[in-house]
Each structure stands twice: as structure tokens, then as C-alpha cells.
């Protein structure tokens, strides 16, 4: 027996609500896991994985879920308020990422090691730079008068697309970091595979949210 359109809609909405809730928990859980693993304060390097996971796993995920109609923690507030909260979270994520990047550069300088010799380091640098550009571009949406010649609809489309790319870059950086000697020396077996699934899961949830709630809608408009 075929399901009605209304039933399918309810099922799909329930699945998106469940996946959004899972993304909240996974983003927080992964960040806590890395913090426990790194023991921040035990060394200069120990702050790097903590700050980067805080930036790209927790803060950035929460910033994007802010616009989810099913799983936003502030969905009862107006879109304008949520947009400002989104920008604040993104700015905090950028600050954490910059600090994490600066500390690992200082750590390598102290050890006399070369910089950006791994895919993880290269992806991380690109993700931080992209996050900086994304935060700057967000100013145009917070204050549209700064870009009077650009249609607001196009700005939103570009920002959503660019934001998704930036989020995926950050997730890729986290994923590549789990192949590092520091991580694999401590986390092995099933725990390693579970950790790898964390940025993959949150990326899938964010991709679904952005593409279905915004990008797909833009494509089908005449």
C-alpha cells in the first residue's frame, strides 16, 4: 500500500528531526572526546586539536543548524535573531581556528619542523582561510546596504553555497587529522572508526539541510 504524500512528509520531517538531533550530540560528543584525549594544557600542541574540533565540529555545526526548521535550538526566535546568533558562532569558530592554527605553527617552530607538509595541515589552512572569507561575506547579509548593487537573493545563494564548501573543508581537515600519528597512536580499533564517522555524519546532515532547504528550492524556482 502506497503511503500518502502527507504521511511521507511526516516521515521525512521526523527523519530530519532525528538526524539534526544526532548532529547536535555527535558534534558535542566528538569535541569532548578530543578534549579528553588531548588534555589541554599538558603541552602547547594539546590546544591545537581541542580548538580545531571546537571550531569545525561544534561551533560551526551549531551555527549552520541554527537555520534548521526541525532541529535549531533557537527555532522559536525570528530569523533575524538566528542570523545574528549564526554570525556570532561563526566568528567564535574562526577565532578558535585561528588560535589553533597559530599554536600549532608555534609548536612546529619550537621543534624546528616544516609547516604544511601534510594533507591535514594544508586542508586545515584552507579551511581557516575560507572561514575568514565566509565571515566577511556574511557582513553583506547582516548589513545589505554595504552591497547595494547585489540582489539579496543572490547573496544568500552564494553565501549558502560557500558556507557549505567551507564546512566540508573543515570536516575534511578533522577527518585527515584522525590519520595523524598523534591520533592513531592513542585511538585504535572500533573507537577510531567511530571517531571517523563523526565528521562524516555531521557533514551529511548539513549537506542535506542546505541543499534541501535552500539550494534545491532555488533550483526549482522558475
UniProtKB/Swiss-Prot annotation:
Its cofactor is heme b. The lineage of its organism: Eukaryota, Metazoa, Chordata, Craniata, Vertebrata. It is a multi-pass membrane protein. Keywords: Cytoplasmic vesicle, Electron transport, Endoplasmic reticulum, Heme, Iron, Membrane, Metal-binding, Translocase, Transmembrane, Transmembrane helix, Transport. It catalyses: monodehydro-L-ascorbate radical(out) + L-ascorbate(in) = monodehydro-L-ascorbate radical(in) + L-ascorbate(out); Fe(3+)(out) + L-ascorbate(in) = monodehydro-L-ascorbate radical(in) + Fe(2+)(out) + H(+). Transmembrane reductase that may use ascorbate as an electron donor in the cytoplasm and transfer electrons across endoplasmic reticulum membranes to reduce monodehydro-L-ascorbate radical and iron cations Fe(3+) in the lumen of that compartment. It is found in: Endoplasmic reticulum membrane; Cytoplasmic vesicle membrane. This is Transmembrane reductase CYB561D2. Pfam families: Cytochrom_B561. Its EC number is 7.2.1.3.
Amino acid at each position: 500500500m502506497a503511503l500518502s504524500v502527507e504521511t511521507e512528509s511526516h516521515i521525512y520531517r521526523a527523519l530530519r528531526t532525528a538526524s539534526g538531533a544526532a548532529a547536535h550530540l555527535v558534534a558535542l560528543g566528538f569535541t569532548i572526546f578530543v578534549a579528553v584525549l588531548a588534555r589541554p594544557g599538558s603541552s602547547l600542541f594539546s590546544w591545537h586539536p581541542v580548538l580545531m574540533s571546537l571550531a569545525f565540529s561544534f561551533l560551526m555545526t551549531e551555527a549552520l543548524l541554527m537555520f534548521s526548521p526541525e532541529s535549531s535550538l533557537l527555532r522559536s526566535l525570528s530569523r533575524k535573531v538566528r542570523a545574528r546568533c549564526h554570525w556570532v558562532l561563526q566568528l567564535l569558530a574562526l577565532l578558535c581556528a585561528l588560535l589553533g592554527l597559530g599554536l600549532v605553527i608555534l609548536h612546529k617552530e619550537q621543534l624546528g619542523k616544516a609547516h604544511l607538509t601534510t594533507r591535514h595541515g594544508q586542508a586545515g589552512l584552507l579551511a581557516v582561510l575560507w572561514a575568514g572569507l565566509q565571515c566577511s561575506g556574511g557582513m553583506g547579509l547582516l548589513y545589505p546596504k554595504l552591497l547595494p548593487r547585489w540582489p539579496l537573493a543572490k547573496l544568500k545563494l552564494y553565501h549558502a553555497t560557500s558556507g557549505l564548501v567551507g564546512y566540508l573543508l573543515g570536516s575534511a581537515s578533522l577527518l585527515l587529522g584522525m590519520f595523524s600519528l598523534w591520533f592513531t597512536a592513542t585511538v585504535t580499533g572500533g573507537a577510531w572508526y567511530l571517531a571517523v564517522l563523526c565528521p562524516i555524519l555531521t557533514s551529511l546532515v548539513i549537506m542535506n539541510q542546505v541543499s534541501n532547504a535552500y539550494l534545491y528550492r532555488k533550483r526549482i524556482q522558475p
